[in-house]
Amino acid sequence: GLKEFREGGISIGPDVISNNIGNGSPADGFLDYADTQKWSIIPAIQMMANPSGIVMQEVIEVFYKHFFESFEQHCADIDGIFLVLHGAMVSEGSDDVEGDLFREIHSRLTAKGVNIPVVAVIDFHANVSKDMTDFSTSLYSYRMNPHTDARKAAVEAATLFGILMRGQKASQHHLGTPYVIPPTGLATASDPMKAVLARARAIELQDPDILCINVMGGYSYADIADCGFSLNCCTSGLASVAQGYLDELLIVFEANMSGAYPKEAALKMVLKCIDTEPRGSGPILLVEPADNIGGGTPGDGTGLLSPLLDSGR
């Protein structure tokens, strides 16, 4: 609810800029690049919270109120809309919060006869829907998991945003898949993500028409229709060529798919291994990543606590 977002941070208007400059976030990356380009930024609202459960409708209403008040006031004077999103939000009223937002922005732009690019930087764990791609000009996802490149991805997304604002024509193409991958299978330093991302970067280098290719691992704990691994491409070239690249990347994924579903060790086996190892002088760390520690959560899930207590430890 709003309590968690207030704790995470709600910034409105100019506070969006002052609260992000220099903090190393994606918003900071965008603002820094915008400054180098001498863009005039009209900030609307930023809301943040730790990853958690379904978002209450009151949160969506607050965001819409401030965002679209700013939109209506400045729509006739802006050259584009840039969003910093996660991409896997589920609320009380919608399984596709970001898709709904893009649809509403597109609807209002169309009603006013305004044709400007709408670009968003999104998380590698985004569950990308058809509405997210149909009603945006381009998405741009993080390339690394853990997300050490979040700020860099925002700078690259802002660079693409500038190209589109200068009049570059582009189309966006998406390929959803039935593959729902646990967080433990999404490390970008290991296959299949490593192989898919390497091929995506090679395609971008070899074909100047490809403005970006996004590889999204998806967020498996969201039980929604668009949950899972997906691919996305923004191109200034032929749609058929872009779609062919996405099909090729899916083949690369499927050829390396075994790594996406690692065999997890049972707790009893882990404890047995611990007991048979020579006792060291330091603590033993038992890391349980189920609450998505790679995405910034505190790692304080208690799912293992009961069986550990049952074992007498």
Predicted feature locations:
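Gly-rich Lys/Arg/Thr-decorated short loops/hinges at beta-loop-alpha junctions or inter-strand turns
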Residues: 10-12, 43-54, 84-86, 249-255
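Hard-cation-handling environments
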Residues: 184-313
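Low-complexity, highly charged intrinsically disordered N-terminal segments
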Residues: 31-71
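Glycine-rich phosphate/diphosphate-binding loops that line cofactor/substrate pockets in enzymes
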Residues: 35-39, 43, 69-79, 270-284
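N-terminal amphipathic/basic leader segments beginning at the initiator methionine
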Residues: 1-36
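Internal, active-site/partner-interface "lid" segment
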Residues: 165-194
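Catalytic cores of large soluble enzymes that bind and process phosphate-bearing ligands
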Residues: 18-26, 48, 52-59, 63, ...
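Active-site histidine-anchored catalytic micro-motif
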Residues: 3-6, 53-64, 74-166, 283-305, ...
